[in-house]
């Protein structure tokens, strides 16, 4: 299984409505194991991440007002991509692991962009 990255909006009654994803759009936020081995890892936590480490214990719901801060966190991880790849568990080569993380960060960034555009939130589950 893999983690899914989705964009949601709040309905007038407060319920979350997950937006439809266009067919063919890849929305993986990483493998299920990445909840603890990458996003929730001690290394990612040591960088000051506070959103993605939530995945170690639960699904991540980033409300609209927190999306800009989440965007900064993802930008921090991207800026330290080589270190994140080296500092987290990997079943593949370092280069493959780095490429996988980069791809997942790009997917998360695209969802953040959409959320900012429409005033929505980001869900990773």
Regions found by a protein language model. Name each.
Residues 1-125:
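Acidic (Asp/Glu-rich) sequence patches and key acidic residues
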